[in-house]
Amino acid sequence: MKPTNCSNLLPQLLLEDYFPGKTKAWGLFEDRFGNVRKQFCADINGTWNGKELCLSEDFLYSDGKKENRNWTIKKIDKNRYEGSANDVIGIASGECCGNSLSWQYDMRLNISGRFISVHFTDRMYLQSDGVMLSKARISKLGVEIGVVTLTFMKNLTSEVHDTGLRNTQPTVVECELGPIQ
């Protein structure tokens, strides 16, 4: 899908408007056969200085592993961005249009102590109430090896656990993940 396919969809997504402050994310990785291999949650802290968006992403995986990724994203023009991160190879490039972002980059993944280079084609879609959905297709040498599905949330007013929303009182949200079934 081309970014222009979402040009009239609202709410409008601009990374520098969405990511400053605290964001929560929950996601999973499915292999090319549709098997869920990992689940995770992330705490994301973002700052925007008028030119660069800095994101610190702290991941907690269902196996207890923790990981940190630090992004520096520059706005190139009205709708285009370039970014780098500690495990991204070269420069990530993206374009916002309407409520969506098309984002592509190469990354070094640590798989059981072995690093492999893969390509991400990521599509993000801003929804109402601070929710953003993301689907990233991961490929190696042009062959899809899996998909990461993510949900981002801003302005949380509910406690979230592995089984879902439990109450509607404002509270701090903590990651809790159970084993993959």
Predicted regions and their residues:
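Amphipathic/hydrophobic helical signal segments and adjacent flexible N-terminal regions
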Residues: 1-37, 47-49, 147, 153-181
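Sequence-level preference for short, compositionally simple segments enriched
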Residues: 3-4, 42, 48-49, 122, ...
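Generic alpha-helix detector with strongest preference for long hydrophobic helices that associate
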Residues: 4, 10, 14, 21, ...
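Generic detection of intrinsically disordered/low-complexity segments and helix-coil linkers/edges
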Residues: 12-13, 65, 97, 119
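Hydrophobic core residues within well-ordered beta-strands of beta-rich domains
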Residues: 19, 42, 118-120
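Central antiparallel beta-sheet cores of small beta-barrel/beta-sandwich binding domains
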Residues: 26, 30-111
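Beta-sheet ligand-binding and adhesion/scaffold domains
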Residues: 81-181
